Structure formats: C-alpha cells, structure tokens
C-alpha cells in the first residue's frame, strides 16, 4: 500500500537503514493483524523493531499479540497506525502505541464532493486541485504522538 511505501521511503531518504522482515494483508482487522503478528513474533522474535500498520485496528492487533507474548511496554516494537481512532488514542496514552496519523475527514469529504461535481459538470477536476498521475489527490494528514496528541 502507498501508506507503507511512503513511510519506508521517508526513512530511507532520512538515512535510516531498513530491512523488511515480512509483510501481509490483515484486511483492516485487529484480529487478523494479531494472527500475523503472532506468526512474526515466533519467526523473527526481537528482530522486529518497527510495525507500520495501515490503520489503527491493525496496529492494536499487533500490540495485542505482543502483549500476549509477554512483551512489556519497554520491549514492544515501535508500532504506528493510521486514523487516530479513540482506542488508538488510548493506546497512545498508555504508551503501547507510538503514533498514529489523523486523516483530514472534512478535507476528504470536501475534496470528494468538489471532484464529483466538477467531473460531472465539466469533465475535469476542479481548478486548483492537483491530481497526480491522473488518479491521486493528496490530502493533509497529521502525525499524532503521546507528546503531540492534537497533531
């Protein structure tokens, strides 16, 4: 997914050495992510340093698996998610989730409506809306951490 791709490319551009140990789909589900993480913990153990989850439920599933495996807060991999859901915000406060990303839901809705109206009436994207590769419109995201809970 683009979220993971851009997260990893940002680390590489910053000079962080990376090694991808594993990747799998968990269909945005906490339970499925927990199953995958349990498998990886058996396979890779403490070699897992970072988990990029493409939504908060999957990040929480990874945390569940780590907790079940007996990992304390200080032993957890660096786990991040996306969406800034209430359960993820609680995990941030507890110190089990390192960060999440808040989507701009209002901006997304406004962009979708603007795009739909413009495409249906004019056949082109709205003026001023930048479209990448003919398919993508980039929206604002906010990093959320325990130190910056408001993003």
Residue ranges and their predicted role:
Residues 2-9, 31-36, 59, 84-88, ...:
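Hydrophobic alpha-helical segments within soluble ligand-binding/sensing domains
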Residues 9-14, 107-151:
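Hinge/cleft segment of the Venus flytrap/periplasmic-binding protein
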Residues 23, 94-106:
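Short beta-strand elements at the ligand-binding edges of bilobed clamshell
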Residues 7, 21-22, 26-89:
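Hydrophobic alpha-helical
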Residues 15, 44, 96:
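Conserved functional loop/turn residues at catalytic and ligand-binding sites
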Residues 5-15, 63, 67, 93, ...:
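Class I S-adenosyl-L-methionine
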């Amino acid at each position: 997914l683009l979220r993971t791709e851009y997260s990893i490319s940002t680390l590489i551009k910053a000079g962080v050495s990376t090694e991808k140990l594993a990747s799998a789909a968990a269909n945005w589900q906490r339970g499925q992510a927990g199953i995958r993480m349990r498998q990886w913990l058996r396979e890779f153990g403490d070699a897992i340093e970072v988990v990029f989850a493409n939504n908060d439920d999957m990040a929480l599933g990874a945390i569940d698996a780590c907790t079940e495996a007996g990992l304390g807060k200080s032993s957890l991999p660096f786990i991040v998610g996306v969406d800034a859901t209430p359960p993820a915000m609680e995990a941030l406060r507890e110190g089990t989730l390192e960060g999440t990303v808040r989507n701009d839901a209002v901006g997304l809705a406004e962009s979708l409506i603007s795009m739909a109206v413009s495409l249906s009436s004019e056949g082109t994207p709205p003026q001023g809306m930048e479209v990448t590769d003919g398919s993508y419109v980039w929206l604002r995201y906010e990093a959320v951490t325990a130190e910056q809970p408001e993003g």
